[in-house]
Amino acid sequence: MLKDITIGQYYKEDSLIHRLDPRVKLFAVLIYVITLFMHKAPATYVMSLLFLIITIKISKVPVKYILRGLKAIAVILLFSVMINMLFIPGKPVIQFWIISISAEGIRTTIYLGSRLIMLVLGTSLLTFTTTPNELTDGLDKSLGFLNKVGVPVHEIAMMMSIALRFIPILTEELQKIMKAQTARGIDFESGGLLKRVKSMVPIIVPLFVAAIRRANDLAMAMESRCYHGGVGRTKLKPLKYEKRDKIAYIVLFVFLAVMIYLSFFSPWR
């Protein structure tokens, strides 16, 4: 399960998506998330899925690597499916004892499940194709206007970047601890759910200690380099829009217009 946690990890590749300005990719994620919650017809789900598939193909990130991240949300997805199928009222199509599953429940489950899957895959693609430094610069530039009203944009962007960077680091640390505990005879794989949960208890304290140690090392490194926020900082590689970024913006606005039409004006809605 631990090796399936891919969120926050950067996949190094030379693709058009990787070369896009991080501000474009942040805007793309925003547009994609907004359109996911606009879905009102099967055509909108098909369009969102098609857009995601094309983007993944262009990014050159292996499909297996991207889909691996879905295992981390399998429990949430399963819980959502069960709740919607069992508790949404309607004309029953499956009746067993006190369990009743309606056509509306099945339809809602399919819609919500596909929406959650596309949401996770779409947002994960941002971290797969954008380094933490690029993500920080992109957020800093995109939300820079909030500095005028006293919002510490650079600090917020830095915290988000550090949090994303810590996910794979802590995952690696957890794997090391589990291997050490396995060498001492603890079995994490066999047994029921309750037994597996109990077997995880001995690794909680070492993991917290490792996390605190890593955070302290990072704080000392930043302090030794005289980090004092974004005031007066310069960039080694300043962000600059290229022709491909402008074309990407046009594609995103066209996609948004199509989704608005399919959601509110199309005869298929």
Please name every model-derived segment.
Residues 51-61, 76-79:
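Alpha-helical transmembrane segments and their membrane-interface exit regions
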Residues 41, 45, 60-64, 88-96, ...:
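Transmembrane helix-loop junctions in multipass membrane proteins, especially transporters and channels
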Residues 14, 37, 60-65, 96, ...:
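Membrane-helix interfacial "entry" motifs
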Residues 67, 71, 107-111, 201:
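Alpha-helical membrane-interface segments at transmembrane helix boundaries
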Residues 74-186:
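Juxtamembrane/interface alpha-helical elements of multi-pass membrane proteins
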Residues 1-44, 48-57, 144-151, 155-158, ...:
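Transmembrane alpha-helix interface motif
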Residues 25, 63-74, 248:
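Alpha-helical transmembrane segments and their helix-start/interface "positive-inside/aromatic belt" motifs
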